[in-house]
């Protein structure tokens, strides 16, 4: 009985909010709060916190390339309104998107399996 696993959205501000609640949730409720990046070791792939930048653009290129229209992106970085992170034209690629997706899934599956074993032992 009781809550054993809570899954939440893990992007940007929500990840930070989960991290801020971590200690209190563990003390008050015995609940472990883990983010998608709790288990990540590769620093280059660990913090994927951009908005329409190279990270998100690369993921879309890997999954739905027909949605990408670089004609809408200005080369001048000072005019990239609404973009945070690496430059979407110069730093994005389908290969990087696939690398991000594969690493994320591998890391999450491994981490969740490890945590699930701990939960079962409680």
Language model features by range: what are they?
Residues 1-122:
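Extended, histidine- and acidic-residue-enriched regions that form the cofactor-binding/catalytic faces
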């Amino acid at each position: 009985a009781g809550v054993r696993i809570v899954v939440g959205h893990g992007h940007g501000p929500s990840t930070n909010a989960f991290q801020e609640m971590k200690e209190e949730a563990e003390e008050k409720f015995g609940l472990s709060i883990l983010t998608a990046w709790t288990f990540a070791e590769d620093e280059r792939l660990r913090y994927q916190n951009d908005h329409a930048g190279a990270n998100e653009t690369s993921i879309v290129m890997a999954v739905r390339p027909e949605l990408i229209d670089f004609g809408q992106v200005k080369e001048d970085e000072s005019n990239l309104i609404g973009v945070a992170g690496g430059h979407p034209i110069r730093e994005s690629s389908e290969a990087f998107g696939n690398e991000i997706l594969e690493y994320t899934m591998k890391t999450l599956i491994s981490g969740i399996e490890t945590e699930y074993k701990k939960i079962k032992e409680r």
